């Protein structure tokens, strides 16, 4: 039996939507002065961040203009991204973002260890989870000799908005 859609004649079901669950993530952001003062060894740096919005009725597509904006700010392209962490509110939303950005539905560098549908979507920590997951994947790829410099982390943040961050492994 197929899962019941969330609304009449809809396609989003509990089977293709991320679970809203509990979770925790720690992510330390520090400026150069704090890094020096406390003897910290950075693992990555934030290259650029951007937010953007679309009409609220087009829920979930906000990461597209945010991604275009952050790449322009960073002076980079999607081809420069070794890892892309795209938060999946639900499958159709993630596919729409991928297709609008010109990425294949099964691009191996997008959510290589699973996205929110597989891992869950704990509200309030999903952004930190995306950055942490991307950094760990960059480090893993570096250890095995794969290209591992930049990661793009992006998600919709409600009411048509999107946020995107580019990090660089250091």
Spans of model-derived segments:
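N-terminal extracellular/periplasmic Venus flytrap/periplasmic-binding protein-like
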Residues: 1-32, 37, 100-103, 107-109, ...
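Phosphate/pyrophosphate-binding loops at sites that engage ATP/ADP/AMP, CoA/4′-phosphopantetheine
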Residues: 35-42, 68-83, 101-105, 142
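Short glycine/threonine-rich loop-to-helix capping motif typified by GTGT followed
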Residues: 56-63, 88-108, 121-126, 163-170
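Generic hydrophobic alpha-helical scaffold/packing signal
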Residues: 47, 68, 82-85, 94-98, ...
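Active-site pocket-shaping loop/turn-to-helix segments
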Residues: 9-26, 47-73, 85-88, 118-133
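Beta-strand segments within the central parallel beta-sheet cores of soluble alpha/beta enzyme folds
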Residues: 40-51, 79-88, 108-113, 146-156
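Conserved beta-strand-centric core segments of catalytic alpha/beta enzyme folds
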Residues: 13-30, 127-170
């Amino acid at each position: 039996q197929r899962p019941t859609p969330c609304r009449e004649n809809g396609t989003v079901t509990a089977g293709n939507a991320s679970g809203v669950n509990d979770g925790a993530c720690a992510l330390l952001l520090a400026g150069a002065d704090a890094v020096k003062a406390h003897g910290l060894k950075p693992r990555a740096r934030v290259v650029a961040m951007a937010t953007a919005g679309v009409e609220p009725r087009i829920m979930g597509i906000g990461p597209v203009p945010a991604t275009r904006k952050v790449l322009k700010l960073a002076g980079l392209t999607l081809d420069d991204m070794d890892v892309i962490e795209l938060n999946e509110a639900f499958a159709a939303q993630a596919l729409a973002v991928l297709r609008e950005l010109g990425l294949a539905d099964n691009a191996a560098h997008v959510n290589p260890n699973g996205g929110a549908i597989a891992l869950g979507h704990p509200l309030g920590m999903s952004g930190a989870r995306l950055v942490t997951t991307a950094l760990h994947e960059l480090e893993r790829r570096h250890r095995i000799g794969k290209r591992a410099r930049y990661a793009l982390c992006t998600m919709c943040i409600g009411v048509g908005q999107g946020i995107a961050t580019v990090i660089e492994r250091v």
